[in-house]
Swiss-Prot record:
Gene3D superfamilies: 1.20.5.1430, Calponin-like domain. This is Microtubule-associated protein RP/EB family member 1. Residues 3-105 form the Calponin-homology (CH) domain. Residues 283-344, 377-459 form a coiled coil. The gene is eb1. Residues 367-403, 410-428, 453-474, 483-506 have a biased composition (Acidic residues). Residues 134-228, 251-261 have a biased composition (Low complexity).
Length: 506
């Protein structure tokens, strides 16, 4: 609907509904939109209740309520922003009018429809409709009354004189009747002949245009009173007289008293239109309801703003949580890879006792996780921990036994060496051999003691490291010990004579 602008929409609505809208904001009353729905779906909207002359917001809201009811009946899923349309927002009214044009082009069947006749039939005309109606009635009404001429006013009198009233006995009268003969029938008419007597003539009759001319006949004498041009022409009917007295024709219409009004006199042939403007103030109840609805709308807007702020905060927190989760997953993968490498290394060198301890520590985590799941599982985890502690104690005891056995073997070897060194050799002198043997024995004892002390210190240091260090430090210490052992195995003695003797003995 981007091709339709404001002027095109206004021209389309004015031509279709025969209105005179000047701005697109006038569609905010909702009346024209309701009649568009009546054109597309006749009888599906309560058009009789729509106010085409609405001027206040609460009247606009009522019109839009009828529009929403019709949408609900027809199943039209269109959200109507009543608050924006009622405030005469140009963009909102233009967008809704464009949607109505699209809906009209899609569902209108092409049946003939006269918008003015429809509004007049439902008694909801606009101001333009009323003015056009008044113009039509003035054009198609009774023909305008022209000012009567004196000849036309005297014409019925002559006709009345030409037809004398029938009498039973012919009588003759004088040529000049007295004025009393004329005034008496007017002042005191007979009850049988006149339905309502006229006691006093109206001011319009008091000054006739022409003087009454008596007419003489052989049978009877009749006098006629001509009416002035300003009075309407009465229809005179002759009254039969039983006597030979002169008779006066009486009008058949009932004279009505003239009401004195401050309006200027009406000129014949002209039409006067009176327009009454009634300014009615809206009832207080509706105003209170409108104010209450405005308050509720403001409160709902505040709540929506608060909810929007809360939603923004939650989205920001969720984004931060996602970032932290990604960082944690990276750290987890990093440390898991390192632990896996350590596990593989320990499995490859499982003959080393320290690495066996490391493997036990690595495999001990499953029992702890299972122990956290329930009370029964906690008990099983405690039992496993006790078994592991017992196993560790057994391993320590075995290591201590091995150390004791090694010490005993070393002591036995030392004693054996001492015995072998204490025996004299036959090829050497008795004086020189004991001195050399004593020196060698002293050096061997010092060397053995120093070596035993170093082994004990290393053993205790290893135990302390295993108990107080983490996995990485344990791995580093194991690798360092292995390198130290390799250095010891690859080391050689010096080229001294004493060292060569010891080497031969070993």
């Amino acid at each position: 609907m981007e091709g339709f602008g404001r002027n095109e929409i206004l021209n389309w609505i004015n031509d279709l509904l025969q209105l005179d809208y000047k701005k697109i904001e006038q569609l905010g009353s909702g009346a024209a939109l309701c009649q568009l729905v009546d054109i597309i779906h006749p009888g599906k909207i309560n058009l009789k209740m729509v106010n085409f002359n609405a001027k206040y917001d609460y009247e606009y809201i009522k019109n839009f309520s009828y529009l929403q009811e019709s949408f609900a009946k027809l199943g039209v899923e269109k959200y109507v922003e009543v608050s924006e349309l009622v405030k005469s927002r140009p963009q909102a009214n233009l967008e809704f009018a464009q949607w109505m044009k699209k809906y009209f082009d899609q569902y209108y069947t092409g049946e003939p429809y006269n918008a003015i006749e429809r509004r007049i039939a439902l008694k909801i005309p606009t101001d333009k409709d009323r003015s056009s109606l008044k113009g039509k009635t003035a054009a198609t009404g009774a023909p305008p009354t022209s000012k009567p001429s004196p000849s036309s006013t005297l014409k019925p009198a002559t006709t009345a004189a030409s037809k004398p009233a029938p009498v039973s006995k012919p009588t003759t009268t004088t040529a000049k009747p007295t004025p009393s003969s004329v005034s008496k029938p007017v002042s005191k008419p007979t009850p049988s002949s006149i339905s309502k007597p006229v006691s006093k003539p109206t001011p319009s009759i008091s000054k006739p245009v022409t003087k009454p001319t008596p007419t003489t006949t052989s049978t009877s004498t009749t006098t006629t009173v001509s009416t002035p041009p300003s009075t309407p022409k009465p229809t005179n009917t002759p009254i039969p007289s039983t006597t030979g007295k002169p008779t006066l024709t009486q009008p058949t219409f009932k004279p009505t008293p003239k009401s004195v009004s401050p309006t200027p006199p009406v000129v014949a042939g002209s039409t006067v239109t009176t327009k009454t403007v009634i300014v009615s103030e809206p009832p207080t109840e509706l105003l209170e309801e409108l104010e209450q609805q405005k308050r509720e709308l403001e409160q709902q807007r505040k709540e929506l703003e608060e909810q929007k702020s809360v939603i923004q905060e939650m989205t920001e927190k969720i984004a931060n949580f996602e970032i932290t989760i990604q960082d944690i997953e990276k750290d987890r993968d990093f440390y898991f890879e390192r632990l896996r490498e350590a596990e593989i290394f320990c499995q490859d060198h499982s003959d080393v006792p320290l690495l066996g301890e490391v493997l036990k520590i690595l495999y001990n985590s499953n029992g702890e996780e299972e122990g956290e799941e329930g009370e029964g599982e906690e008990q099983g985890g405690e039992e496993e921990e006790e078994e592991e502690e017992q196993g560790e104690n057994n391993i320590e005891q075995e290591e201590e036994e091995q150390i004791e056995q090694q010490q005993q073997q070393q002591e036995e070897e030392e004693e054996h060496e001492r015995e072998t060194l204490s025996e004299p050799e036959p090829d050497q002198d008795n004086s020189a051999i004991p001195l050399e043997q004593l020196e060698i024995n002293d050096e061997e004892e010092e060397f053995n003691q120093h070596q035993e002390q170093e082994e004990e210190d290393e053993h205790f240091e290893d135990e302390e490291k295993v108990n107080g260090l983490n996995e990485e430090e344990i791995m580093n210490s194991v690798l360092q010990n292995a390198s130290d052992e390799d250095d010891i195995l690859e080391s050689t003695f010096d080229g001294n004579e004493d060292d060569s003797l010891l080497q031969d003995e070993y």
